[in-house]
């Protein structure tokens, strides 16, 4: 098999190949001509998709799986004591992080890299959608399933690539984008960074990696990104947001059950009159999603998309799996309007607050029930006070036990202590669920006609959200 390297390097073995990020790397490497194999702890849809492309996937992590591999690729989720990693190092096989391989891949194309604490997956999807609509046909590597593709990956024919970066371990600063998008910067992954100054430095480096012909797209609604914009002195920058001073600004926003409707005001250089793209519709609610759309619109305009192409593509956007995704409806015994069930990946307080604000905008005075499964004890501990105050837009809050994600419990950091803190912060209806198995019966007592149940978390709550309609009807 021909490869994009000047000499044979042997198969690339991807540890955790079924993961959303690693499966995308596998796809693009296959398309480029690399020989790829991998392993994961269990079968999954991504594993089966890769097998259908001819990839050998081992189930279980074992030292013998890496025999004959030319390199081993790992993500931040793979521990140093993983048996395949240990075997590779003992055998002198290079062990490469996902970001390093992504940097190698993106070196060969003009690349739009999306970074930020929140909104990366949706923004990446929107950029891909608008560039597709403009006939640019980029290659796409995303951190979530794009409904239009049925996958987190698309092989494009153009010289452009759109990728979601990963700032969790700082390796996103190794990327060399042509366009660097920064959606927001909040304290997250502080176990790696330690201080906000170190986190800021990583984003500074990410933007400084732009070539002289590249540009940064920065959301100045967020104070940390606005401060970053002020530090960008030798790269071209374009700001976006609701901020009155933004170069690409959303105005006249309204929301209904069909999504967000708004105009975009575009201001170029000093002295140039602003112009507008009017009557845009995004089939997603929430100011945060409009901000994500503004980033995509900015990139599309820079790459030559017409106003008409942008409007049509935005209106047809199919969304991303687990981003305010409707997964069912249930008609209460009282009749009337059905109860809507929403599944969302939000697991950080800022994300939860944004999702619930969007839900409230859609629901008006109808009931919103937030169901939260905290993800990781360490995150709950580090952001405990923020978690205690992010549910104000919900009428009722149900908190399930913490999804451990391999972590050891931390004394005093439980879903019960979170509920007590939510109550102390003034919420009138918050309760702890013994388990998510109790959810259907509790929803039946709280949800009247027209209510919305929003299931939030990065753990297995998505399975319960998907089953909730059937269990309510059963």
From Swiss-Prot:
One of its GO terms (biological process) is cell wall organization. It is an enzyme of class 6 (ligase). GO terms for molecular function: ATP binding; UDP-N-acetylmuramate-L-alanine ligase activity. It catalyses: UDP-N-acetyl-alpha-D-muramate + L-alanine + ATP = UDP-N-acetyl-alpha-D-muramoyl-L-alanine + ADP + phosphate + H(+). It is found in: Cytoplasm. Its EC number is 6.3.2.8. GO terms for cellular component: cytoplasm. InterPro entries: Mur-like_cat_sf (IPR036565), Mur_ligase_C (IPR004101), Mur_ligase_C_dom_sf (IPR036615), Mur_ligase_cen (IPR013221), Mur_ligase_N (IPR000713), MurCDEF_pg_biosynth (IPR050061), UDP-N-AcMur_Ala_ligase_MurC (IPR005758). ATP binds at residues 116-122. Keywords: ATP-binding, Cell cycle, Cell division, Cell shape, Cell wall biogenesis/degradation, Cytoplasm, Ligase, Nucleotide-binding, Peptidoglycan synthesis. Pathway: Cell wall biogenesis; peptidoglycan biosynthesis. PANTHER family: UDP-N-ACETYLMURAMATE--L-ALANINE LIGASE, UDP-N-ACETYLMURAMATE--L-ALANINE LIGASE-RELATED. Cell wall formation. NCBIfam families: murC. Belongs to the MurCDEF family. This is UDP-N-acetylmuramate--L-alanine ligase. The lineage of its organism: Bacteria, Pseudomonadati, Pseudomonadota, Alphaproteobacteria, Hyphomonadales. The gene is murC.
């Amino acid at each position: 098999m021909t490869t994009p390297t000047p000499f044979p390097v042997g198969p690339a073995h991807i540890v955790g190949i079924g993961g959303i990020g690693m499966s995308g790397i596998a796809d693009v490497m296959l398309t480029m001509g690399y020989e790829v194999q991998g392993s994961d702890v269990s079968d999954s849809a991504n594993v089966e998709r890769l097998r259908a492309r001819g990839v050998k996937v081992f189930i279980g992590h074992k030292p013998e799986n890496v025999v004959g591999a030319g390199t081993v690729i790992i993500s931040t989720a793979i521990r140093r004591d993983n048996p395949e990693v240990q075997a590779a190092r003992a055998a002198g096989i290079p062990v490469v992080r996902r970001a390093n391989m992504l940097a190698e891949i993106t070196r060969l194309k003009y690349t739009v890299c999306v970074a930020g604490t929140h909104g990366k997956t949706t923004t990446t999807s929107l950029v891909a959608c608008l560039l597709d609509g403009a006939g640019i046909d980029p290659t796409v590597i995303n951190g979530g399933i794009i409904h239009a593709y049925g996958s987190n990956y698309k092989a494009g024919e153009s010289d452009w690539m759109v990728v979601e970066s990963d700032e969790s371990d700082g390796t996103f600063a190794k990327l060399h984008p042509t366009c660097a998008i920064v959606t927001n910067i909040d304290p997250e992954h502080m176990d790696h960074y330690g201080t906000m100054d170190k986190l800021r430095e990583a984003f500074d480096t990410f933007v400084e990696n732009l070539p002289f012909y590249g540009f940064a797209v920065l959301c100045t609604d967020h104070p940390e990104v606005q401060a970053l914009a002020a530090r960008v002195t030798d790269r071209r920058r374009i700001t976006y947001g609701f901020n009155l001073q933004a170069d690409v600004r959303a105005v006249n926003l309204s929301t209904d059950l069909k999504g967000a409707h708004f105009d975009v005001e575009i201001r170029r250089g000093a002295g140039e009159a602003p112009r507008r793209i009017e009557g845009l519709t995004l089939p997603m609610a929430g100011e945060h999603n409009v901000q994500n759309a503004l980033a995509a619109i900015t990139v599309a305009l820079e790459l030559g998309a017409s106003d008409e192409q942008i409007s049509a593509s935005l209106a047809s956007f199919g969304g991303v799996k687990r981003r305010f995704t409707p997964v069912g409806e249930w008609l209460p015994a009282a009749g009337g309007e059905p109860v809507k069930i929403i599944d969302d990946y939000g697991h950080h307080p800022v994300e939860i607050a944004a999702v619930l604000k969007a839900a409230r905008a859609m629901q008006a005075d109808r009931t919103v029930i937030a169901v939260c499964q905290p993800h990781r004890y360490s995150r709950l501990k580090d952001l405990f006070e923020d978690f205690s105050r992010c549910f104000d837009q919900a009428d009722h809050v149900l908190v399930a036990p913490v999804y451990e994600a391999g972590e050891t419990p931390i004394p005093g950091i439980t879903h019960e202590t979170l509920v007590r803190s939510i109550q102390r912060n003034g919420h009138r209806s918050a309760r702890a669920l013994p388990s998510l198995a109790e959810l259907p019966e509790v929803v039946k007592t709280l949800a009247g006609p027209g209510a919305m149940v929003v299931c939030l978390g990065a753990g297995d709550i998505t399975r319960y959200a998907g089953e909730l309609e059937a269990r309510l009807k059963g």
